[in-house]
Curated annotation (Swiss-Prot):
UniProt entry tagged with the keyword Transcription: yes
Protein name (database record): Regulatory protein HrpB
Keywords per UniProt: Activator, DNA-binding, Hypersensitive response elicitation, Plasmid, Transcription, Transcription regulation
Superkingdom in the source lineage: Bacteria
PROSITE patterns tied to this protein: HTH_ARAC_FAMILY_1, HTH_ARAC_FAMILY_2
Biological function: Positive regulation of hypersensitive response genes involved in plant pathogenicity and partly of its own synthesis in minimal medium.
GO biological process terms held by the UniProt record: positive regulation of DNA-templated transcription; symbiont-mediated perturbation of host programmed cell death
A Pfam family recorded for this sequence: HTH_18
The organism's taxonomic lineage, starting at the top: Bacteria, Pseudomonadati, Pseudomonadota, Betaproteobacteria, Burkholderiales
InterPro entries the UniProt entry points to: AraC_XylS_family_regulators, HTH_AraC, HTH_AraC-typ_CS
Span of domain HTH araC/xylS-type: 375-477
Length: 477
């Protein structure tokens, strides 16, 4: 899972100024020490100025695979954001986006990261982080053109600030994508249908599967976080092994041993990546040795929501060892999982460069941030969004809570009131319809009426505030 490494880098980069020791520990891949440096923040529950420390503590918990503790930490950090509804909304998207990505819930992650990148209340670093998260999601789904778009937008934002840390991270991601996709799309792994059928972006092709090496745009002599440097060296070794270079074997085995310190998720993923590289380089003895190291505890992680690479390796190794029946069985499981993912996860995933968010996307990122009880309220809103008389009082009554409780729950989890959520969904739905040439939306008022907005003045005022243009301008784009 690529998200582990880049979540760590994003966390460290965001905390550099307020928590430099924590950031340095994360950059050194010492997640235990990073947690120890911010653990004391968990007891300071009422201090709003301690928000950054609590957020770092939650990040460190997630890096250490303490998911329940991390989720509680994220909730606490959001409760401490009292100075800005904008920041509460953005941070809520950020926290839920990373959790969703690390759980392989790509549609929800993409929705959250898109919101984060597009939100006018986000800082430029938060927008870059959102775009990086979106690029990771698209890559995991084999949508490399869309991933390139997100990275291009992230680079433009970071270039404008000359931030070397973010620029180096973006360079590393580009190299990562080139190496990982280059290996999976090699001629010796033709049965890896999920990747062989993926779209390959121009940036990836220009890097020739990572054979051009890692060329960061950061000036020579500038200190580079150890986590970035080690990852680049590891990717270079993977590329060499995939090209049949046996001199890469021992350094890669050493990297495997080091990965044990970074948690079972990353260890499992590293082993699978080494197996794929060895198979691509026809180094079957290495592939077999590393595959056999994947113990039962790690295959529990192998049964995560989506893990095509592991399932493919299992089928490929069975075939390599002469177990034709086992290979067919495992390959069937692999294909079923790949198709199921494409059918369920790609529906709401969209390019960062697309003109507008679609209303249907809201059901992912908002519901992902709400508790189960209030997700019922949100579903009720979606089902009745076209009704102009829909009120928050009615929504609250539907789930048997007070209107005040509904307001507080939405504000703390999403950073918006229920009425703001309703208004945003309606305006996004209107905009989506206006941009849909198949609908031929000649009458703006009729289009707005379908989404529950009857007042022309309310439509124009709200639409311009949200999209910085009038509805008529959208039609004539």
């Amino acid at each position: 899972m690529l998200g582990n490494i880049y979540f760590a880098l994003a966390s460290g980069l965001a905390a550099r100024e307020r928590l430099p020791e924590y950031a340095n520990a994360v950059f050194a891949a010492d997640f235990d020490r990073a947690y120890q440096l911010v653990d004391h923040h968990s007891s300071q529950r009422g201090k709003s100025d301690d928000y950054a420390g609590v957020l770092a503590m939650a990040d460190a918990s997630l890096l250490l695979e303490c998911d329940e503790e991390a989720e509680e930490g994220f909730r606490l950090a959001q409760r401490l954001i009292r100075h800005s509804d904008d920041q509460l909304r953005v941070v809520s998207c950020r926290n839920t986006g990373w959790q969703a990505l690390l759980r392989d819930r790509y549609a929800a992650a993409a929705s959250c990261f898109s919101r984060m990148a597009e939100d006018d209340g986000a800082t430029w670093t938060q927008q870059v982080e959102g775009l990086i998260g979106l690029a990771l999601v698209h890559h995991q789904l084999g949508q490399q053109d869309a991933s390139d778009d997100a990275l291009r937008a992230a680079r433009e934002a970071a270039d404008g600030r000359s931030d070397r840390g973010w620029l180096a991270t973006i360079d590393l991601i580009i190299y990562e994508f080139a190496v990982q996709a280059g290996i999976r799309c090699s001629n010796r792994l033709l049965e890896h249908a999920f990747w062989q059928s993926a779209e390959m972006g121009a940036t990836l092709l220009a890097n020739h599967g990572g054979r051009n090496g890692w060329t960061p745009t950061v000036s020579q002599g500038v200190p580079m976080p150890a986590l970035i440097q080690r990852r680049a060296e590891y990717l270079s070794l993977l590329r060499r092994m995939a090209d049949g270079d046996r001199a890469a074997i021992d350094p890669l085995m050493a990297t495997l041993n080091h990965s044990r310190k970074l948690g079972s998720r990353l260890l499992m993923q590293t082993k699978v990546e080494v197996v794929l590289a060895a198979l691509s380089g026809e180094q079957y003895d290495v592939a077999g040795r590393v595959f056999d190291q994947i113990c039962n505890r790690e295959t529990t992680y192998g049964a995560r929501r989506w893990n095509f690479d592991f399932l493919y390796c299992r089928a490929k190794m069975a075939a390599q060892r002469g177990d034709a029946a086992g290979a067919l069985k495992f390959y069937t499981t692999y294909m079923q999982d790949a198709l199921r993912c494409l059918r369920t996860e790609t529906v709401n995933v969209r390019r960062a460069s697309a003109a507008v968010p679609v209303a249907s996307r809201a059901s992912d990122d908002v519901s992902a941030r709400l508790s189960a009880k209030y997700r019922r309220a949100y579903r009720y809103i979606i089902e009745n969004i076209e009704r102009s008389d829909l009120t928050t009082r009615e929504v609250a009554a539907h789930i048997n809570v007070t209107e005040r409780a509904l307001q507080l729950a939405f504000k703390s989890a999403v950073g918006m009131s229920p009425s703001s959520v309703i208004r945003r969904m309606r305006l996004e739905g209107i905009r989506s319809d206006l941009l849909d040439s198949e609908r031929n939306p000649s009458n703006i008022i009729d289009t707005a009426s379908r989404w529950g907005i009857r007042s022309r003045s309310a439509l124009v005022k709200g639409y311009r505030k949200q999209f910085n243009e009038a509805p008529s301008e959208t039609i004539w784009r």
